[in-house]
């Protein structure tokens, strides 16, 4: 840490090349907090922004609008739901667990999948490469993961992140009407596929 940034008398404890923080983002020096890349977190701007909001609310003494947690080793501070986006053509976005990750945790899941080749907006724009894959907990039907590859995937993933953060089920997600023609209609189609694979038809 550059001396000009904190002053000569500030000695912040380091861990594996990053500033060591506790579950409240406090460093070893009273009154000094650390967020984002310097604190060995997920290196995404929206993660650092959420952590910054958390710290400011704590300092101001107001209720937290964002829930944060620390993983068991105490090194990496993370959000319960972090969307990851890749800005390629088509775009790639993911949030929550994949089928494989859920299986590795011994979770039983059911999935819904939709190919964007049949999506009305994709046909209009001639961008039909891509898919939507949704992962639901087997018994409750709660959404626990989503992977989207298509135009506007990085925008569409926010709906999925909100659903996971609030514990929404496939039934609840089906209550939303999605405009036509939009890429987001593919989300509804993927949910319908989930019900079809379970032997249930929801339209």
Q: Model-predicted segments: where are they?
A:
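FAD-site-proximal beta/loop scaffold in flavoenzymes
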Residues: 1-63
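Short beta-strand-initiation
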Residues: 16, 70, 129-131
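Beta-strand-connecting loop/turn residues
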Residues: 17, 30-31, 73, 139-141
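A generic short alpha-helical patch detector that favors 3-5-residue windows
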Residues: 24-27, 63, 67, 152, ...
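Solvent-exposed alpha-helices and their adjacent loops that cap or buttress functional pockets
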Residues: 26-27, 31, 67-68, 124-127, ...
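Active-site-proximal substrate-binding core of FAD-dependent oxidoreductases
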Residues: 40, 58-95, 179
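Conserved protein kinase catalytic domain
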Residues: 53-56, 72, 83, 161, ...
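Flexible, glycine-rich terminal cap/loop adjacent to redox cofactors
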Residues: 76, 86-203
């Amino acid at each position: 840490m550059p001396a000009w940034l904190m002053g000569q008398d500030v000695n912040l404890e380091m861990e594996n090349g990053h500033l060591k923080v506790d579950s409240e983002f406090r460093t070893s020096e009273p009154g000094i907090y650390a967020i984002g890349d310097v604190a060995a977190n997920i290196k995404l701007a929206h993660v650092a922004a959420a952590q910054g909001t958390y710290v400011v609310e704590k300092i101001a003494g107001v209720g937290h609008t964002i829930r944060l947690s620390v993983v068991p080793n105490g090194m990496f501070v993370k959000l319960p739901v972090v969307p990851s986006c890749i800005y390629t053509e088509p775009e790639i976005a993911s949030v929550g667990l994949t089928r494989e990750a859920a299986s590795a945790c011994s979770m039983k899941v059911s999935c819904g999948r939709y190919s964007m080749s049949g999506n009305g907006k994709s046909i209009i724009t001639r961008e039909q490469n891509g898919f939507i894959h949704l992962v639901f907990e087997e018994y409750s039907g709660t959404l626990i993961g989503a992977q989207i590859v298509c135009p506007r995937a990085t925008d569409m993933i926010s709906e999925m992140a909100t659903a996971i953060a609030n514990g929404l089920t496939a039934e609840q997600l089906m209550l939303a009407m999605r405009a036509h023609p939009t890429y987001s209609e593919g989300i509804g189609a993927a949910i319908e596929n989930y019900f079809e694979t379970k032997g249930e038809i929801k339209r």
